[in-house]
Amino acid sequence: MQLLKSKRLMLLLITLASIFAFGVTTSLAQEKVKTKRKDYSVMVKYETFKVDDIEGHALNLYESRGVGVGSTGENAFISKGQSDLVKGNGTHQGYYKNTDKDGDVFFSKWQGKVSTTQSPEGKPIMKWEGTFSYVKGTGKWENIQGDGTYKGGFIARGIYVNYVESEYVIKK
């Protein structure tokens, strides 16, 4: 009889431990969110510094502002960056501050490559692509973690479009 009570108690404890462990494991699992958006942006500041070590080498500092539209809704953003280009080809990097319609913000850091070709009319066509990672968030974006890719290019003087895909989680 005592043995039967011990077995029942042990079975009850194992069951409770399993329920607790499963519940904790489930709550620790974070749902990954995949996003796609299209960013429209205008350069508002642009400064070039010629390096003069080789022909066409320049460092550029810039700021752009724009609107993103996609799977997470609409948002306004500011992007600040720099590029190191030789005849329009090279690298770029910077930071992105996104503010959604509720005023919540996330920041990301981006880096990539820039390439420039000539159109049949002889005009330069500048395109870029790269990666980014989320670095901080406020409000609903607090504890955001993840990364993504972007591709873009100028569509008119000082106006560009980026196609952005990402995956993120909000850590609890």
Regions found by a protein language model. Name each.
Residues 28-172:
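Beta-strand-enriched cores of mature, soluble protein domains
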Residues 5, 21-23, 78:
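Compositionally biased, low-structure terminal segments
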Residues 2-13:
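Bacterial N-terminal signal peptides that target proteins for export
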Residues 3, 26-27:
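Glycine-centered signal
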Residues 12-23:
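Bacterial N-terminal signal peptides
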